[in-house]
């Protein structure tokens, strides 16, 4: 079994964690071999350790380890903190601590898996700063940087729009279309 990684992309406050958890719930309840990896960066923010976010080598290693330990144990890993975000965040915190070799290392980690990439449409609601290092404008800037990264790296992605439940249903159907007919057939309609 080759592990597939389902990546939820978007700046802080875009709904990555909520939609990733929703897709995990839906796939798990349908009987699929799936695990949810949470965002290590958010753990750092909750611990008031925002300076740790500057060390993107550490952040990348920690986040990738969460995926690597599940390889060949589950068919799907869902993450709200894709490894490719290390290249985006490496420049944000008072200049880069590392060179663009971090970007290359992140791409090497990314290329180890079959990836499904969802870019989230930013919800039209009041931005909640709680648990985030960026403000709303900083988060929108990250959204834009992610789109540029998709283009420059030529990474395929599906733009996921809609309210929480609707977006989770769309993601579920999209993943189903990427899976085998035997496994997903009854979920496609």
Predicted regions and their residues:
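Conserved nucleotide-sensing/catalytic segment adjacent to the nucleotide-binding pocket
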Residues: 49-98
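The conserved Walker
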Residues: 12
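Hydrophobic anchor at the beta1->P-loop junction of P-loop NTPases
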Residues: 8
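Active-site flanking residues adjacent to catalytic metal/cofactor-binding acidic residues
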Residues: 38, 79-81, 120
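Conserved substrate/cofactor phosphate-moiety recognition/catalytic segment
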Residues: 21-65
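Phosphate-binding P-loop
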Residues: 1-3
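A glycine- and Lys/Arg-enriched "phosphate-lid" helix/loop adjacent to the NTP-binding pocket
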Residues: 93-173, 179, 184-188
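Conserved lysine of the Walker
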Residues: 16
